[in-house]
Amino acid sequence: MQRLSLPAPAKLNRMLHIVGRRADGYHELQTLFQFLDRSDTLHFSPRADGAIHLAPAIADVDHDANLIVRAARLLQHASGTHQGVDIHLDKRLPMGGGLGGGSSDAATTLLALDRLWSLDLGLPRLAELGLTLGADVPVFVRGHSAWAEGIGERLTPVTLDTPWFVVIHPGEEIATPAVFGHPELTRDTPPISMARALRGGAEQGRAWRNDCEAVVRRLSPDVAHALDWLSAFGPAMLTGTGSCLFCPLTSERQADRILRRVGSHWHAFKARGCNTSPLHDALGIHDEWSPMSQYGDA
């Protein structure tokens, strides 16, 4: 195989509750992950000398610290292969926006090189490796909408509705440590069952919420303003720790109408929700997971 070009899709946190804090400082979460049909694109070309090269350079990110390079080297080490790769990144997803771009790029790298280098490690092992790179990487490896607990690594596949979304990036990054380290962050939301979470989004509208929103509003008046503006069209929310915001909509036409009204000072796009990752679709992967229905069991 000479070359692979694959998507690294965005994700949304359709809801995000912080239910505790561990002794090691990590936060215990409950969240619903869903993919979007908007992606970065990575191009992989094998090399025989074992070198890992990534281009173009990303401002303020050291080459060797980039999650893409780290994922490639992790896979080399775990498999014992001496193969290398040239990687070209076409970046479309904003950095620091809560869309999971870096984690998704890392997951795409793991799956691409598993295929390109003929390693056949399997999704469970690749997800295990991905977790050492970041808590969001496993859901991108497994490739299905999921209910997540723990620090985000305990995953149960689910089937969600797949509306159109308008996503707004107000133009700034929100540092995750600034949010999770904020003294006013809610850290004691009572845990709920997965089935209740799934029913809540369908039956109660605004029942899906993001516990990070209040802190992000304090940290960024621009995000607060954009969120208030988008909320006029539906149940707008923050994804992850921000700064991207999203609003589920009933039709692409409605999304187009909203996009025409977005000010030029905000970057915005429309995307469709997906239950199966565009990466898995591109690779023809059919995971062994058996998702629950949209509303779950009682």
From Swiss-Prot:
EC number: 2.7.1.148
Record keywords, A-Z: ATP-binding, Isoprene biosynthesis, Kinase, Nucleotide-binding, Transferase
Single annotated GO MF: ATP binding
Active site: residue positions: K11, D136
Enzyme class, broadest EC rank: transferase
Binding sites annotated in the UniProt record for ATP: P94, M95, G96, G97, G98, L99, G100, G101, G102, S103, S104
InterPro entries: GHMP_kinase_C_dom, GHMP_kinase_C_sf, GHMP_kinase_N_dom, IspE, Ribosomal_Su5_D2-typ_SF, Ribsml_uS5_D2-typ_fold_subgr
Reaction(s) this enzyme catalyzes, per UniProt: 4-CDP-2-C-methyl-D-erythritol + ATP = 4-CDP-2-C-methyl-D-erythritol 2-phosphate + ADP + H(+)
Disulfide feature: none
GO biological-process terms attached to the record: isopentenyl diphosphate biosynthetic process, methylerythritol 4-phosphate pathway; terpenoid biosynthetic process
Annotated pathway: Isoprenoid biosynthesis; isopentenyl diphosphate biosynthesis via DXP pathway; isopentenyl diphosphate from 1-deoxy-D-xylulose 5-phosphate: step 3/6
Function summary: Catalyzes the phosphorylation of the position 2 hydroxy group of 4-diphosphocytidyl-2C-methyl-D-erythritol.
Family listed: Belongs to the GHMP kinase family. IspE subfamily.
Protein name (record): 4-diphosphocytidyl-2-C-methyl-D-erythritol kinase
Gene behind this protein: ispE
